[in-house]
Every structure is written in structure tokens, then in C-alpha cells.
């Protein structure tokens, strides 16, 4: 396959590179938001309230974990049920450098839009209860002070489709 305009080939290695670029972009943007909310965020190493069983990720992201952590998957012991299988006994993430998108934005103030055919678009917001701050209600934050769900998921679905997968297929982390 030839190179695309962005310099990546269209095969698996090119898609893997684009996924890494996307994760890096998410990390930078999330880092900016973390800086804006430093007084409210209680997230940190060992905080695992968001790291629960039942979280699903895009198949293309699960493949990244499989590729970079084959020995952990083969020989490691998963965290006991109830928390993410990738947590170590101290609550630290064993795949942190390759963690999926959802894990890179956990804890941030989130917003998403629901477009109703019969009515107006409705905005919803949420945040981890540990990071809720009554002195700064979510409803009063500017849209640029929240992580907007949707755009990155769309880009992940595109990468997954290009890899040959079903665009919206999700994989459990356990």
C-alpha cells in the first residue's frame, strides 16, 4: 500500500501510528483541561474509582494493548474482579503508556450532545463524584472547560473501520 497524504501507509502499521498520534493529541488536550481544573481533580496514581470492570474500548485500542503487552497478557495475573484487569496490586495501571482513550479522559468534566429529531439538541454533563465541586457547578463551566464526547470516538471508529473492523465494535478490558 502506498503512503497517504499524512505520511502513513494505510496498513496496520500506519493505523497503529495514527492511533498513537491520536492518543498523544488526547493526552495533550486532556492535560490542558487538567491544568484548568487542578483544584477540583482528585485523580492520581492509585485512584481507581473509574477503573472498574465493564469498561469497553474500541477494538483498535485493544489491539494496541495486545501488541505492546503480550507478555503481561500471557503471564500476568489480572486484578481481581471489580476493578480493571490491568491494575497492579497497588492500583497503578500496568498498561498506562498504551491506555485507551476512555482512560485518558476519566475524571474530567464531560459534556455530550444528543440531537433529537423532534426537538432541540440537548447537552448533558457529568463528572466523577470525587471531582464534583459544589463551588464550581458543571452547569456553569464553559463548553471549552469540559471534554466533549463524540469527536474522538468518531476518529477511533474511522481507524477501526480502516483496520477492517466493525466501526463501533467494543472490547471489554477483562
Predicted segments — roles?
Residues 1-45, 49, 56-174:
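Short loop/turn segments that flank or connect secondary-structure elements
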